[in-house]
Amino acid sequence: MSVFTPAEVEYLKSQRLGRLATVSAAGDPHVVPCRFRYNEELDVLEVGGGNMGKSKKLRDAAGNGRVAYVIDDSPEPRKPRGIEVRGRAEVVLTGGDEIMKGWDPEFIRIVPSHVAAWGIDTDPFKPKGRSV
């Protein structure tokens, strides 16, 4: 059983870009837009892109092990929707280049521990979060 609702899964499958938040060993926050895919088999998000192997986001994820990722849009005025996923970051050193064209071999797999959504199964202005 997925940690995401069926409507959330459909939303994740329809999107390709989100924002990854990490924290450095010194405690400095870092947020960067990057591509992702939802891996339905593992029920995780996989985040990657070009130059991932040398990126701050990969170093932060490897060092801290905790990340957050937000996917959102607003297809109509005043109708925002999105999902925030917080969880454990697994740095995977091979296979990213087989997931998506333009990705480096290295990528970050996010294993969800908390999901918050708005405008998908809920009112767009009343996010609902849950530990998973």
Predicted feature residues:
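Short, basic/aromatic recognition patches
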Residues: 1-19
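Short beta-strand segments
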Residues: 16-50
